[in-house]
Amino acid sequence: MDKIFSHGGFSQRLPSASALGKIFSAMPLGDPLYQMLELKLAIYVDFPCEMKPGLLVTCADDIELYSIAEDEIVRFNKPGFTALAHPSPLSIGTTHGVFVLDSHKKSTNSEMETISCLRFLHKPSIDKMRNCGAVLKRQSGCFSLSDPEFVYTDSTYYVDFNTAKSLLNVLKELGTLDCEIDAYGDFLQALGPKATMDYTNNTANVTTKERGLVEVRQKIFHLLHETPLNVILLNNSKFYHIGTTSEYLFHLTEDVALRSELGLMSSAFSGHMNKPSERAFGSCVMYSVLDSSCSVGSGSVVEYCRLGAGVTIGEGSLISSCWVRLGLSVPGRVFMHSLCVNHLGQTGFVTVVFGISDNLKHSVKASANLEGLKLFGLCLAECLSHWETENEVLRFSGDPSSCSLWNACLFPVCTDQQSSFLMSLEMLQAAMQGSTFTLPKETKLISMQESLQFKNLEEMLAFRMGLYNDITQRNLNS
């Protein structure tokens, strides 16, 4: 049996996970700190012994917790695909996969039931869920959901060995792929007796519209459309999605249910003061070294950071992989993340900064339409004016016809990590306070997209190793 953990793609909604992938996102558990990978393996520890040879595919940005009766076992032993399904509100279904079940075969209200699936819908509208028969009425019993109506949404699925071999043969036939295939949308939508080919031409949920995608989807459909899709209904289960900055902050700082169910900590594998008054209730600090005079606001997460004396972090912010000089104050509701890059033959550092609610995926067709892009809740053109930068000078990396915060070259490359953080913070403060900040001459600006292309993972991991050594030494001395 093989396991496939999707690393999380571009992680445009949680950019702190972009460099390494969401599967390596920090979780406030353990000593040393657990990552999502370890948590997933712990949750699935009982699966392998009840699984025939095949593949198990799971996402890197969700947590599934479930309860079943002592005499029930989750088994992956049927031909074709077998997917786990969780009762969810209709609103959750619009951003996930939804199963259309054969309601005539659903006979019990037990905690677990295996049933055949007629069709899989990928991020459908509520109207489509209703029209396709995916919406069900809640009945009394073991359901953990209180909504009167619900749908079954996806999480993890299994592919038996023979089906996996067939997919491998298709890959060999296609040769080198020139397009990105979605392990959920492009495979599961082909399954079930009521599946149609309509989805193969729908590119609404595709990050980059690449040539050949429709043809590849159609080949996959013709291969899989008669393959069975079995669904294991986990009626007493909870599905937590943590793939956005807002979700990450909420579940790690405010979600009382998840914190109690998993035993999440407010401070995990960190070297700092033990005075509770210095760290607001509902904050989360992971794998970081903080001076005893630091203050972290409620609802904020600090991970893989060094914070100097007197540093204050506002409420509801996410600060990741940063080295913050003494005395600096970070506003609330902002995202700041430092990366090491190899740029123009030299090692440098970039700190990207966005508002927590900024939409990095939203794009406009030309750089002349900057009023359509919002940074820190402000029009991007207004931010540029505070940095004494002309709209026409702003460069966008990658596809020139798609201009977004993701590929806007806004962030200065600096020689060291502390200077990088300071300069980006000064740009943020100028925009939010309506003041002016002038970039030093010859400063090179790159985008978040380019930061990933130029990333120097060795240096980024070396920074974490330095934190590890300091934290371990402090814990030994305490």
What kind of region is each of these model predictions?
Residues 18-19, 25-176, 233, 464:
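Conserved core of the sugar-phosphate nucleotidyltransferase
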